[in-house]
């Protein structure tokens, strides 16, 4: 199959091999003309083979080029989709919720309720306050509302008030329990330590007893307790001495018998009556009626009960009847008729000049024992004014009379005092002008 003068057939295989240079030349060369088909056979075969190889190469190259854009498009599309999904994730992660306020839900609710003038809010009003105050509660997250309701209903420091008649709306008012005032520190809404509440619960009875006894809460005290009067006030049943100037004397008892810090009692064998210094720091006792006896008659005596008058040896207040209307102090426990039963008797005690403390030790001892100081802890830390208010133990006792015995202290106008032990608590009348009253723990 060899032709004379023709080239060997080996170059035909070499021409069909896809050489990059030949492929480029075939793509750039114009197509063969139709007149070249009448040429010699070897040339024709070689040209046809070359053209076929060129067409094969061109078809393969075109297919490759067509497949390349499709692959490029696919890769570009996939990359775009991946970039789009990554951008969506980044965009969603960039919209983070605002940070929660650094307070517990209890503190937030307390903050909302205390911002109200009436100190009470409905649930929707609490929501509105929190949304207006903190950006955390304005987002799409609504789980905080469940937390608010949970804390309102399960914490005992919040009280649900009954709905008032005629009030529009369906929500109940919520307020703070007054007993939970120690839950938060003053000036902030941070919780106190865990054991602080139990300590406050343990100290609460003592706190109320002290407040009610010392007169810090006027609504907790009986009507007989009187507060301290200003220095410009008229003379009355007030004691400005002792315990920081707080008035702790009930209006039915002699403040002069309390022996303020300005008084200087002399505790000798002569039993002198304590003399009170006439300085403005201590006021003096005027006519102060106390609860009357069974017959409507008050007791008489320098500290035993009844109308307590200023003694001539212990008070510079004159004993003139003209001063009766000016310095008389009425007690709510008595009526105006609970005075001396004798019409001619003066409502003020005046010690006769003949009766001196050294000449009559019995009378002066009775006066002195009644003028001894009251015990604050025994007398005025009790709520019951009639039952538990008692004259306490004196600081200096001059007699060995038992405190538990019930004595009827009788004092007539002549200054002679006598003691009648009574088992039935009856009342003795010494003369026309002497009256008495049962003194429960009478200390002499």
UniProtKB/Swiss-Prot annotation:
SUPFAM superfamilies: Winged helix' DNA-binding domain (SSF46785). It is found in: Nucleus. It comes from the Eukaryota. One of its GO terms (biological process) is positive regulation of DNA-templated transcription. Residues 76-87, 293-308 have a biased composition (Gly residues). GO terms for cellular component: chromatin; intracellular membrane-bounded organelle; nuclear body; nucleoplasm; nucleus; transcription regulator complex. Interacts with the transcription factors TBP and TFIIB. This is Forkhead box protein F2.
């Amino acid at each position: 199959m060899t032709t004379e003068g023709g080239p060997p057939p080996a170059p035909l295989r070499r021409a069909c091999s896809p050489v990059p240079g030949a492929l480029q030349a075939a793509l750039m060369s114009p197509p063969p003309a139709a007149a070249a088909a009448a040429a010699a056979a070897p040339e024709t075969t070689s040209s046809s083979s070359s053209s076929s190889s060129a067409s094969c190469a061109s078809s393969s190259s075109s297919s490759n080029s067509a497949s390349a854009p499709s692959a490029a498009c696919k890769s570009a599309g996939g990359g775009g989709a991946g970039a789009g999904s990554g951008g969506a994730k980044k965009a969603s992660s960039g919209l983070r919720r605002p940070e929660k306020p650094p307070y517990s839900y209890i503190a937030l609710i307390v903050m909302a309720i205390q911002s109200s003038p009436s100190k009470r809010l409905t649930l929707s009003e609490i929501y509105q306050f929190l949304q207006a105050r903190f950006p955390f509660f304005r987002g799409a997250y609504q789980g905080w509302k469940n937390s608010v309701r949970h804390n309102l209903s399960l914490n005992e420091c919040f009280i649900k008030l009954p709905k008032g008649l005629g009030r529009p709306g369906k929500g109940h008012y919520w307020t703070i329990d007054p007993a939970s005032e120690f839950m938060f520190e003053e000036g902030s809404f941070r919780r106190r330590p865990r054991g602080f509440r139990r300590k406050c619960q343990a100290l609460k009875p003592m706190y109320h007893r002290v407040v009610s006894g010392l007169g810090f809460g006027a609504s907790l005290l009986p009507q007989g307790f009187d507060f301290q009067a200003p220095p410009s006030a008229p003379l009355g049943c007030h004691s400005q001495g002792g315990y920081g100037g707080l008035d702790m004397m009930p209006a039915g008892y002699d403040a002069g018998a309390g022996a303020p810090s300005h008084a200087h009692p002399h505790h000798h064998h002569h039993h002198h009556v304590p003399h009170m210094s006439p300085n403005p720091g201590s006021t003096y006792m005027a006519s102060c009626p106390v609860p009357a006896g069974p017959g409507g008659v008050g007791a008489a005596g320098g500290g035993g009960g009844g109308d307590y008058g200023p003694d001539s040896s212990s008070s510079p207040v004159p004993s003139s009847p003209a001063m009766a209307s000016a310095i008389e102090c009425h007690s709510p426990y008595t009526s105006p008729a609970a005075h001396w039963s004798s019409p001619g008797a003066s409502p003020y005690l005046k010690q006769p000049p003949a009766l001196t403390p050294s000449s009559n030790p019995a009378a002066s001892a009775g006066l002195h024992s009644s003028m001894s100081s009251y015990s604050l802890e025994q007398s005025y830390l009790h709520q019951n004014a009639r039952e538990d208010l008692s004259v306490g133990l004196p600081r200096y006792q001059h007699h060995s009379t038992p405190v538990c015995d019930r004595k009827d202290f009788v004092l007539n106008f002549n200054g002679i005092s006598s003691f009648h032990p009574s088992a039935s608590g009856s009342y003795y009348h010494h003369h026309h002008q002497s009256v008495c009253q049962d003194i429960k723990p009478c200390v002499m």
